[in-house]
Amino acid sequence: GDDLGFLTCFALKDGKHKWEFKTDARIVGTPAAADGVVVFGSADANIYGINAKSGKLIWKHASSKAVLGAVTIEKGIAYIGGSNGSFYAIDIKSGKLRWEFTGVKGYIETRPLIYDGKVLFGAWDNNLYALDKATGKKLWSWDANLTRMHFSPAAVWPVAADGRVFVTAPDRMMSAINATTGETLW
């Protein structure tokens, strides 16, 4: 995606232009593709599902504000955050909303992590959120206790291993968080 609102597809084999799809505003977040569908958000306040071969629109889900978040897809469900304080789980084949979590106070642009039945993502309200992957229910949130927004979990993509979630803020400090409870380990 680009600042002009185009999502462009190039052939993996030779880099030749295959298709492009135009939205009404810039595309900021990294798209994701699975099962022949490319999913991405746009600053035009929509989330799109595009046919990966043809570049044709399959579905469009409207949001109330720009959707700048990167997408993660797992088992046919796309997970993406918006600028309206909402986080979405959408069926990639039908575009049907599985659930929407509306408890975020800042906008979301980070790429979600799927780990141990949870969806984890940071937001510009200085929190890292853990939602139940199946229901969208908030399990916990972790406050970075930082006074500057730019040292927020929103600016990083979380990773996880051995029951711990790791985030490194732009100040280069790494934190380990218990993936079950959201408690800071170090």
Q: Where are the regions a protein language model picked out?
A:
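Short loop/turn segments that connect beta-strands within beta-propeller blades
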Residues: 11-15, 51-54, 91-95, 132-135, ...
